[in-house]
Regions:
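Sec-dependent signal peptide recognition
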Residues: 1-4
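N-terminal signal peptide c-region/cleavage motif recognized by signal peptidases
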Residues: 7-10
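Long, structured ligand/cofactor-binding scaffold of large enzymes
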Residues: 81
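Domain-level detector of nuclease and nuclease-like folds
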Residues: 84-90, 95-263, 277
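Surface-exposed binding patches on compact interaction domains or structured appendages
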Residues: 266-278, 297-335
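Core beta-strand segments of extracellular beta-sandwich domains
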Residues: 279, 287-297
Length: 336
């Protein structure tokens, strides 16, 4: 039996109050891991087309006002047809899924690095790394290019180079994947990556991504897309919220805690939103009690507690159905 406990509050609006609280005071690799623990849980759409799948996500995340598809891979104009796939377009893993063995896990379905892409350029991109093309491109469609990498002198194989106006978008997608899925460290198989949780990136790749992140600042469209993904998945991309986080995780400020804004709005430290409690297997007549710690910050009103279950006769009860602001601030344990 699983229980979803929801605490009613007035907390909402873009970056929720306290969302990054558990990352406060952390530096370098510890900061990255703290962010991993914050963003790793998400509700993913299934992969593919149709209702409840990737193309429904794209309908909300990558649709221009005129109904056309926002395509970072080509200048071709194509239009949405409901939640159906679109001829001439692919669901593109910007960080190739073969880099973690092609396992169809959450990263395979994560909209923060999935994009609707021109099929021809996507097939040319294949599973090549990002880079900056030197010499005559293998393919150039006027927006994206494929060819030999000329960035640095470590990796000289084929690479995919997006347009300058999208390089930061790709960099922030890559930083997100390396953080949200840092537990995939042993799976990484890429010219850009190492098999560790930090620093993750080969030195040339890290330099490339950091330069792209710095030179192509986040746009309003990128922010709006991230908010649309957040509404679907329930987790955020911290590198869009705070692009300079990369300096504190990988750059010249790794010994300095990131200066997150002061928290002035009310929020819960525990439990996190959508926390699930596992009662295990219970037989008829069994009794079991689970403790749940509640703690908040900047609270001024009483918290009302309730649960959502699929059946009306759940047999569940709470030791109390409300917690005062002072109780929550000081920390309160309730019994379920």
């Amino acid at each position: 039996l699983f229980l979803l406990l929801t605490v009613s509050s007035l907390i909402c609006a873009q970056i929720p109050a306290g969302y990054y609280y558990q990352a406060h005071g952390k530096t370098g690799a510890e900061l990255k891991t703290a962010l991993h623990n914050i963003i790793k849980e998400a509700s993913m759409l299934k992969y593919g087309s149709g209702e409840g799948a990737t193309w429904e996500g794209f309908f909300y995340t990558d649709q221009n006002p005129d109904g056309s598809v926002f395509d970072m891979y080509s200048n071709e104009t194509r239009y949405f047809n409901g939640f159906n796939g679109i001829d001439g377009m692919h669901i593109e893993h910007s960080l190739p899924n073969s880099w973690w063995g092609g396992i169809k896990n959450n990263a395979y379905k994560d909209l923060y690095h999935l994009y609707p892409a021109d099929a021809t350029m996507n097939m040319s991109k294949s599973n090549n790394p990002l880079g900056e093309v030197s010499g005559t491109p293998i393919r150039d469609n006027g927006l994206s290019k494929m060819g030999k990498n000329g960035f640095g002198n470590t990796y000289t194989g084929n690479c995919f180079e997006p347009a300058d106006i999208y390089k930061g978008d790709f960099a922030r997608s890559y930083f997100y994947i390396a953080t949200a899925y840092e537990d995939y460290a042993s799976l990484w198989n890429s010219p850009m990556m190492q098999n560790n949780t930090w620093p993750v990136w080969q030195s040339w790749a890290l330099q490339l991504l950091m330069e792209w992140n710095k030179n192509d600042l986040k746009s309003t469209r990128e922010e709006e897309r991230a908010e649309a993904v957040y509404k679907i998945q329930g987790n955020r991309n911290p590198f869009i919220d705070y692009p300079d986080l990369v300096d504190y995780i990988w750059g010249d400020k790794t010994s300095t805690p990131y200066p997150f804004p002061d928290e002035t709005e009310p929020f819960l430290i525990s439990p996190r939103n959508n926390k699930t409690l596992d009662f295990g297997i219970l037989l008829q007549g069994d009794n079991k009690t689970i403790d749940l710690d509640i703690q908040g910050k900047n609270l001024t009103e009483t918290l009302n507690l309730y649960w959502k279950t699929e059946g009306e006769n759940s047999g569940l009860s709470l030791s109390q159905e409300s917690v005062t602001a002072n109780e929550a601030i000081n920390g309160k344990t309730i019994h379920i």
